[in-house]
């Protein structure tokens, strides 16, 4: 298996060397206690991933602001605790992750307008925050519109002071992660969360220095990267996850992405991960539609491979991590061998088998042909759920199997 491109090590710009090209990418664990710190449940979940032979493990998102959570069970930088208390909690987590030498990266996030009512300490009457006051659109039916209004509401546009506070929150969280023993952080600017809301012209309608042009919309992300770099050692890894956009290389949306990605590269990131989708259009779970047709699960994989191929020449030497839909060793090896991406990210298959690299991909007794399939469970929503007309609800019913698996592991250790 040593001749596989997937098995080759890679050294990131910060100097961090990953032993191979397989990354266990982020999936929300949904197991945090009410104090939002890390408990033994996280240790039980991450122990198998730590010994699984991954080149890199990315944690599920940790929210930088305890007032706003993506779910009621997200871990966060809790404002009620001191830096020492948070580091004390995170250090044990990092020690579990580092037990077998696997580089572990903490994903940092803020949900913005995708925070459901009551998630976090802001209170049920407080508005969500976003780049602009653009409400969620989770469906065209009356029920979908009602759910959107009740669960998410219309966010308020962030002030410049709010933006400065957010930059400091990301920088502080990164510093605490570094002090706790993590190898780096990944900034979450995908899946419709707050940083993605700033990057997108659809959700950022600001008229000030943080809106309008693609560069202005990326300004907050660039400022966060620079602020994080100022707080952590040069050897600390700083990555980012961005959203694949639709359309050909000639479209304005694609060109805007390239301009923003180049600014982000110049600001000093060590890798870029590509995924896709939002709560409104969750293509990270179901695959992107092509020409109006649903994703063909039987004959296609690698949801965002075409997009990765299109952007790869524009990213210079910054390594590209591609996540979403890979379900065979052959497809993963081919993507890296061709140079479409530098690393492959797996989330759902990593929940099914936390030891996947060791027991399957790099195991010559199992992966003899080089085209072994990866297992992932799909659980379509019942017909009566589909009647609600809320795509995200249908998809998250499918995702519930994986959440349940992690919750069971957190409780029992198996």
Swiss-Prot record:
Catalytic activity: 8-epi-ilicicolin H = ilicicolin H
Swiss-Prot/TrEMBL GO biological process terms: ilicicolin H biosynthetic process
Residues reported in the UniProt entry to bind substrate: 188-191
Top-rank EC class of the record's enzyme: oxidoreductase
InterPro entries noted in UniProt: Aldolase_TIM, NADH_flavin_oxidoreductase, OxRdtase_FMN_N
Metabolic or biological pathway, per its Swiss-Prot or TrEMBL entry: Mycotoxin biosynthesis
Record keywords, A-Z: Flavoprotein, FMN, NADP, Oxidoreductase
Superkingdom of this protein's organism: Eukaryota
EC number in record: 1.-.-.-
Protein's UniProt keywords contain S-adenosyl-L-methionine: no
One MF term in the entry's GO annotations: polyketide synthase activity
Signal peptide positions on this chain: none
Stored Gene3D superfamilies: Aldolase class I
UniProt binding sites for FMN: 25-28, 107, 347-348
Biological function: NADH-dependent flavin oxidoreductase; part of the gene cluster that mediates the biosynthesis of ilicicolin H, a 4-hydroxy-2-pyridonealkaloid that has potent and broad antifungal activities by inhibiting the mitochondrial respiration chain. IccE acts as an epimerase and catalyzes the conversion of 8-epi-ilicicolin H into the final product ilicicolin H. The biosynthesis of ilicicolin H starts with formation of the tetramic acid by the hybrid PKS-NRPS synthetase iccA with the partnering trans-enoyl reductase iccB since iccA lacks a designated enoylreductase (ER) domain.
Family: Belongs to the NADH:flavin oxidoreductase/NADH oxidase family.
Protein name in UniProt: NADH-dependent flavin oxidoreductase iccE
